[in-house]
Amino acid sequence: MPIRIGSRIFDPRLFTTFLTIVLIAALLALGRWQLQRADAKRALDERFAAGADATRTIDRETPPLLRYQHIEAPGAYDSARQVLIDNMSSGQGRAGYFVITPFALRGGGWILVNRGWVPLGASRADKPQVAVPQGPRELHGRTDDLPRAGLQLGPRAPLTPPYPVVASFPTHDEIAGLLHERAWSRAAAVVLLDPGEPDGYLRQWQAPGFPPMRHVAYAVQWFGLALTLAVIYVVTNVRRAAADGADPGAGRR
């Protein structure tokens, strides 16, 4: 139904109105989603910062811990059975691997340790040398998850030697199957070795994802697009009113 406002008439078509409402609703939903992601990233950053406030000593029986909890554990590395997670990048965008080393806990049980990033060699057939000295030591690091692929298509072949085994986004179960070990600590899927610890490589640990303000900026863009669409809808559907006695729909035929 046309609405007269002074010398102007607002007279949108039904289909145009419906389409505009749907698009604006979608844009607003995307904006809210980005704000939610910003809140989630803030919480993750706060958890990462708070993880170092207290250190937990872990063993095989330790229950699952919150992500980024700082831990310590006595034990020894198993240098002979390591995994290189492929397609990992450094902070400068260089291609390489994360070095995942099994750690035998004193008293029994195992946990995986991410000892850091190493660069890709001249070719993928040229595996990096990642041996670590044997012997007892005290492990210090943060609990975390293994890197996950954004999209995985279909089942994958099991991991097989020779070591070090190169794998793209392996799961904990896949690595456990490769090592033929069943006694795993439940504290975490992997421990990020502290930057100050020996026997590690490049370690620039931080909570993954964009900074919160990046998500806020994306939200502002979505809200701005919604506002722009609303303005276009109004402007394109307002016309000058016809003179008295003229056919008000003449300009729309």
Model feature map: region roles:
Residues P2-T62, Q69-R253:
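Surface-exposed, charge/polar-rich loops and edge strands
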